[in-house]
C-alpha cells in the first residue's frame, strides 16, 4: 500500500507539471463528482441479484442491497430500488419488499391471478418493521434504512425475494434488467455485471449451495449530485483566543424569507409531509444558513495531554437526525486516549499506514438522535488526546481539524487564515522561557564548579 501511495503521489506531481492548474483542478473535481471518497476509497452500495431457480418463463430471484460504506448510511425514508426490464417481464410475487404500483396487468386477466407488478420500470420499497411473518425474509423490513458498516454492521444489508415471469410474447430465459437506481439523492449506479455465483451456507455450515448465476451493480455517492449546496458548517474557538471563529457567511445559502426567525413558530402545519419523501430543511435564520453546525473548541492544555470539546447543533426545524455520525480528520487522532459520551472508531482505509481520521456517533438510547432545532437540539462530547511531542503545537491553527463530515457530507470550514491563533505574548514568552532556562543551566554549571574549587 505504501508503494501505491508513492505511485499516486508521483502521478499527481506529473499531472500537475503537464496540466494547467485549472485543468488539474477540473480533473480532481470530476473525481469527486464521480463518487470517489479518499476517506472511504472502497465505499459503495452493491445491488446483487442471485438467480436461485429457473424454469421456462418463471425465475426465482433474491436481490440484496449491501452498504459497503464505512460511515455513510441510508436513512429514512429509505432506498427505492428501480430498474428497466428489457423484455417486458413481470413480477408475479414478492417477499420482503413490494412495488409502489402494480401497473396495467390486463394482458394476464385470463390467468386467474394477476401479477404483483407489470410495470416496465418498477419501483421497489422495503417493507416496514412489523410486517406479517409470511411476507418476511432475512434482512428485510426496516423501511429501507441501511446502516453504515462501522456504526451498525448488523443492519447494513437489505434483501427481498421475487418470482419473475416472462411477458406473453417475451423470451423464456432470464435476462438481467438495466438502468438501476436506488432512489437516494447523490447515488448513481452502473449496469449489472456477471460475477461468481453466490454460495449459501446450510446445515450449520456443513453444506454449501450456490446460485445458478449472480450479477452485481455498484452504486456510488457524490455530494455534488446529492445537493446543490452544503449541509453543514464548522465554527472554531480556543481557550487562548478571545473570539469565536464562526461558520463562513452563507456557507449553505444566504438568509431568506424561508428561514425561521427568533420568536417565530416553525411552520410545521403548513408543510406537506409525504412519508415516502425526505422533508426539505427549514432552518433557523443565521449567517451560515446550514441545517447543522459543528463547533470545535480547544478547551484545556495539560502537560502531556490536551482536551477538545465537540458540539453538533441542529438548526433544522423539520428533522431529527437519527443515528447521526461525525467524521473528523486531524493528525493527533492517532493518540486519542478517551472519548466521553460518544462512540468512537479510528478509520484507517489505507491498511493502518495513515491514522488521522476518526468517526464519532451517539450512544444508543442516550444521544443517538440529534433532535430538531431548539434548546435540546444538540449533542456534545469531549475527547482527551495525548500530545505527540514530535509535531504537537498550538501555533498556526494546528489544533483544529482539517476536515469534518456530518452523515457523510463535507462541512464548510473557516479559512485557515481565520483560525484562532496564539497571542503574540505566547510566542515571546516561550522564547523568553527558553532563554531563562538556558541561563539557569549555565549558572548552575558554573556554581557547581566554583564550589568544587573551594
Swiss-Prot record:
Proregion positions: 430-454
GO BP terms in the entry: cellulose microfibril organization
Classification via InterPro entries: COB_C, COBRA_pln
Entry keywords, A to Z: Cell membrane, Glycoprotein, GPI-anchor, Lipoprotein, Membrane, Signal
Tissue expression notes: Expressed in flowers and siliques.
Top-level division of the source organism's lineage: Eukaryota
Chain positions carrying an annotated carbohydrate: 104, 191, 320, 355, 391
UniProt entry tagged with the keyword Amino-acid biosynthesis: no
Segment forming the signal sequence: 1-24
Membrane topology type: Lipid-anchor; GPI-anchor
CC annotations in GO: plasma membrane; side of membrane
Family: Belongs to the COBRA family.
Protein name: COBRA-like protein 6
Organism of origin: Arabidopsis thaliana
Species lineage: Eukaryota, Viridiplantae, Streptophyta, Embryophyta, Tracheophyta
Amino acid at each position: 500500500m505504501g508503494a501505491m501511495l508513492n505511485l499516486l503521489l508521483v502521478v499527481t506531481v506529473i499531472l500537475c507539471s503537464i496540466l494547467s492548474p485549472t485543468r488539474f483542478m477540473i480533473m480532481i473535481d470530476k473525481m469527486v463528482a464521480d463518487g470517489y471518497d479518499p476517506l472511504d476509497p472502497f465505499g459503495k452500495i452493491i445491488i446483487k441479484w442471485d438467480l436461485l431457480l429457473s424454469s421456462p418463463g418463471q425465475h426465482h430471484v433474491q436481490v440484496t442491497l449491501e452498504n459497503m460504506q464505512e460511515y455513510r448510511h441510508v436513512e429514512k425514508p429509505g432506498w427505492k430500488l428501480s430498474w428497466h426490464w428489457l423484455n417486458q417481464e413481470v413480477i408475479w410475487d414478492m417477499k420482503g419488499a413490494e412495488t409502489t404500483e402494480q401497473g396495467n396487468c390486463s394482458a394476464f386477466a385470463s390467468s386467474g391471478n394477476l401479477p404483483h407488478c407489470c410495470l416496465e420500470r418498477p419501483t421497489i420499497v422495503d417493507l416496514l418493521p412489523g410486517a406479517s411473518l409470511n411476507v418476511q425474509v432475512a434482512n428485510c423490513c426496516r423501511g429501507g434504512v441501511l446502516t453504515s458498516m462501522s456504526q451498525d454492521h448488523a443492519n447494513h444489508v437489505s434483501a427481498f425475494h421475487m418470482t419473475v415471469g416472462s411477458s406473453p410474447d417475451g423470451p423464456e430465459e432470464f435476462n438481467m434488467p438495466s438502468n438501476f437506481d436506488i432512489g437516494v439523492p447523490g447515488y448513481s449506479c452502473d449496469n449489472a455485471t456477471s460475477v461468481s455465483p453466490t454460495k449459501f451456507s446450510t446445515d450449520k455450515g456443513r453444506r454449501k449451495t450456490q446460485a445458478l448465476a449472480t450479477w452485481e451493480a455498484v452504486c456510488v455517492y457524490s455530494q455534488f449530485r446529492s445537493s446543490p449546496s452544503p449541509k453543514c458548517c464548522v465554527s472554531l474557538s480556543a481557550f487562548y483566543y478571545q473570539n469565536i471563529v464562526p461558520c463562513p457567511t452563507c456557507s449553505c445559502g444566504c438568509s431568506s424569507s424561508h428561514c425561521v426567525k427568533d420568536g417565530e413558530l416553525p411552520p410545521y402545519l403548513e408543510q406537506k409531509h409525504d412519508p415516502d419523501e425526505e422533508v426539505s430543511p427549514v432552518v433557523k435564520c443565521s449567517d451560515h444558513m446550514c441545517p447543522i453546525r459543528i463547533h470545535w473548541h480547544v478547551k484545556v492544555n495539560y502537560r502531556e495531554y490536551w482536551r477538545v470539546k465537540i458540539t453538533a447543533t441542529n438548526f433544522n426545524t423539520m428533522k431529527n437526525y437519527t443515528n447521526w455520525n461525525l467524521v473528523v480528520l486531524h493528525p493527533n487522532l492517532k493518540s486519542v486516549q478517551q472519548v466521553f459520551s460518544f462512540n468512537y472508531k479510528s478509520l484507517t482505509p489505507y491498511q493502518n499506514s495513515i491514522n488521522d481520521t476518526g468517526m464519532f456517533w451517539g450512544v444508543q438510547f442516550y444521544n443517538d438522535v440529534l433532535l430538531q432545532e431548539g434548546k435540546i437540539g444538540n449533542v456534545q462530547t469531549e475527547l482527551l488526546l495525548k500530545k505527540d511531542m514530535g509535531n504537537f503545537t498550538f501555533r498556526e491553527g494546528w489544533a483544529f481539524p482539517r476536515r469534518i463530515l456530518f452523515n457523510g457530507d463535507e462541512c464548510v470550514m473557516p479559512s485557515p487564515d481565520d483560525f484562532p491563533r496564539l497571542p503574540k505574548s505566547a510566542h515571546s514568552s516561550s522564547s523568553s522561557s527558553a532563554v531563562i532556562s538556558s541561563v539557569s543551566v549555565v549558572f548552575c554549571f558554573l556554581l557547581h564548579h566554583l564550589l568544587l574549587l573551594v
